[in-house]
Swiss-Prot record:
One of its GO terms (cellular component) is cytoplasm. Catalyzes the attachment of serine to tRNA(Ser). Is also able to aminoacylate tRNA(Sec) with serine, to form the misacylated tRNA L-seryl-tRNA(Sec), which will be further converted into selenocysteinyl-tRNA(Sec). Homodimer. The tRNA molecule binds across the dimer. Its EC number is 6.1.1.11. It comes from Cronobacter sakazakii (strain ATCC BAA-894) (Enterobacter sakazakii). This is Serine--tRNA ligase. The gene is serS.
Length: 430
């Protein structure tokens, strides 16, 4: 959520930055609501002061033996007016908050202006795409031929955009996630976490999935029903539970940064992607991901973004997968992000780079929603932390990249060297 003080004092500047993201802020409405809030705030405070004064007068009049009934009636009337003013102010504040919850984060000044992914800026490339002297097969053909990817059974069990993995392909999928976790915990300084796959609405508000993206989630009960302790949603990413671990906390600055990782399934309705990537593992309702989250001091967050992106890059480098690093333009960034890098891995069968990791600095956007703060020993004042998240990596898409980049002419798949210890020394599948 954006800083309410910024919305109050610099609405035009906020509107200009939001316009870079293609979002139109109704400044006139916001200014009118703010003016009304000021009036109601003063009215409420004046009524409260007047009521307190009159209440005090009752005691004084009673001590003098005077008739207190007129004063008592006046105090009761003031109380009714005060309650009405408070209710009106609360309703207005709720309206302002509802507007604030729909506003995306402001883009950093370094973010290039653009409408969509066609205007993202390539930062660098690593590795050289392999040249094949045989006809390239895509991951679906490779996986089905090897008996390791069974989409037909998944359709029978559930529906489209699901898969059953079997045998050595399933084992390779597991090996990838174990390799990623080991790398991040043993070399990159993250602590491993096991988190719930179902979360409540407060958690989803904290990281920004609600209220705007309710339709992208799988809910245990209709969202229209009143939220209670049994109203959950499946996590779209481990970012949600991991980041919310610091919700409503005041953290000693000396303990920052906090670096967390988790391997979880992720569940997404893909409501806005009808007809896109219908073949294979690229866009699934259920997929695994190893997530990285950092909670840092505000002054450290941009450097932390570079570090985190480097951690995701290291996975690809050790796997020997060619990729490119892209800085997202203002129109392509996620709702809560201030600055984002995407890593796109080379997929030979598609003859293009496809997203495999997204690393974002969320600034204080999530922290303000979660009321996650930090405090130094030398200063009693608290301040909002900054939060970051990144894929390290999407396991299914990494499997796709390994299958396609390491395929052999005879249909076998070579196992990348770093994965062989997780596969009991196996060098090839098939």
């Amino acid at each position: 959520m954006l800083d309410p003080n910024l919305l109050r004092t610099e609405p035009d500047a906020v509107a200009e930055k939001l316009a870079r993201r293609g979002f139109k802020l109704d400044v006139d409405k916001l200014v009118a609501l703010e003016e009304r809030r000021k009036v109601l705030q003063v009215k409420t405070e004046n009524l409260q002061a007047e009521r307190n004064s009159r209440s005090k007068s009752i005691g004084q009049a009673k001590a003098r033996g005077e008739d207190i009934e007129p004063l008592r009636l006046e105090v009761n009337k003031l109380g009714e007016e005060l309650d009405a003013a408070k209710n009106e102010l609360d309703a207005l504040l709720a309206e302002i908050r509802d507007i604030a919850l729909t506003l995306p984060n402001l883009p950093d000044d370094e973010v290039p202006l653009g409408k969509d992914d066609s205007e993202n800026v390539e930062v660098s490339r690593w590795g050289t795409p392999r040249k094949f002297d045989f006809e390239i097969r895509d991951h679906v053909t490779l996986g089905e031929t090897l008996g390791g990817l069974d989409f037909a059974s998944a359709v029978k069990l559930t529906g489209s955009r699901f898969v059953v993995m079997k045998g050595q392909i399933a084992r390779l999928h597991r090996a990838l996630s174990q390799f990623m976790l080991d790398l991040h915990t043993e070399e990159h300084g993250y602590s491993e976490n096991y988190v719930p796959y179902l979360v409540n609405h407060d958690t989803l508000y904290g990281t920004g999935q609600l209220p705007k993206f309710a339709g992208d989630l799988f809910h245990t009960r209709p969202l229209e029903e009143e939220a209670d302790s049994s109203n959950y949603a499946l996590i779209p990413t481990a970012e949600v539970p991991l980041t919310n671990l610091v919700r409503d906390e005041i953290i000693d600055e000396e303990s920052l940064p906090i670096k967390m990782t988790a391997h979880t399934p992720c569940f997404r309705s893909e409501a806005g992607s009808y007809g896109r990537d219908t073949r294979g593992l690229i866009r699934m309702h259920q997929f695994d991901k190893v997530e990285m989250v950092q909670v840092v001091r505000p002054e450290d967050s941009m450097q932390a973004l570079e570090e985190m992106t480097g951690h995701a890059e290291k996975v690809l480098q050790l796997l020997g997968l060619p990729y490119r690093k892209v800085l997202l333009c203002s129109g392509d960034m996620g709702f809560g992000a201030r600055k984002t890098y995407d890593l796109e891995v080379w997929l030979p069968a598609q003859d293009t780079y496809r997203e495999i990791s997204s690393c974002s600095n969320m600034w204080d956007f999530q922290a303000r929603r979660m009321q996650a703060r930090c405090r130094s020993k030398s200063d009693k004042k608290t301040r909002l932390v900054h939060t970051l998240n990144g894929s390290g990596l999407a396991v299914g898409r990494t499997l796709v990249a390994v299958l396609e980049n390491y395929q052999q002419a005879d249909g076998r798949i070579e196992i990348p060297e770093v994965l062989r210890p997780y596969m009991k020394g196996l060098e090839f599948i098939g």
